Swiss-Prot record:
This is EKC/KEOPS complex subunit BUD32. The gene is BUD32. It comes from Yarrowia lipolytica (strain CLIB 122 / E 150) (Yeast). It comes from the Eukaryota. GO terms for biological process: positive regulation of transcription by RNA polymerase II; telomere maintenance via recombination; tRNA processing; tRNA threonylcarbamoyladenosine metabolic process. One of its GO terms (molecular function) is ATP binding. It is found in: Cytoplasm; Nucleus; Chromosome, Telomere.
Amino acid sequence: MITLPEQLEKLSKQENLIAQGAESLVYSAQHPYLPQQECIVKYRPKKPYRLPELDAQLSKHRTLAEARVLQKLALGDVEVPHLVFIDAKNGLIYMEKIEGLSVKQWIWNEEGDTEGGAQEAGDKSRSLPDGDVSSLKDTLVLVGQEIGKLHKSDIVHGDLTTSNVMLRDGKPVIIDFGLASVSTLAEDKAVDLYVMERAVLSTHPVHSQQYCDWLFEGYLAVVGKSQKEVMRKLEDVRQRGRKRSMLG
């Protein structure tokens, strides 16, 4: 059973748990300083299988690391949720609530696939309506640009998917930096791009190649020749992925 810190236990009785992952619980709660606004509270619960001292140390370290990443990116003009408050001892991060759809859901809406994932990868007969193409391209190019700014800041997300990019007033905001790390390595950034590429293939199979082309168009417009090594490494990562698929 998950034991919540006292302040979060009070919130959880009246507010909503909106997401639950392997490492954290995410709540929508009242903003601590602006009562008329909501914010997001991310909580890393205790792991009963760890030694308590080690668990507390890891939770504090990861909470502080995520907060530092958010602060670094905000200062670097990358669109991410603004930090509101952190309680590293209890594994809590309060941050801005981004109002809008995930890019995944937005694409499904644009495709007319409200159930999500209903299209099959082999169904090539379904083309995008003319009016949607411009909107899809413009938005995915913007997403690629935001990823480019992320990597130029030497931050690797660790779980780049269309679920972890929100659209606020049509502009992308990258969320969920629980697996993020600082890295200057082209290999790490290439793996980040590969994860996004595979996510697009999985959740938007019919037009995945076109969507990825637009993402990379935006990415390269930001990083330019400075990240040419990243794209070369991406091809290496793809080849390793194909080999693993063949070997099962």
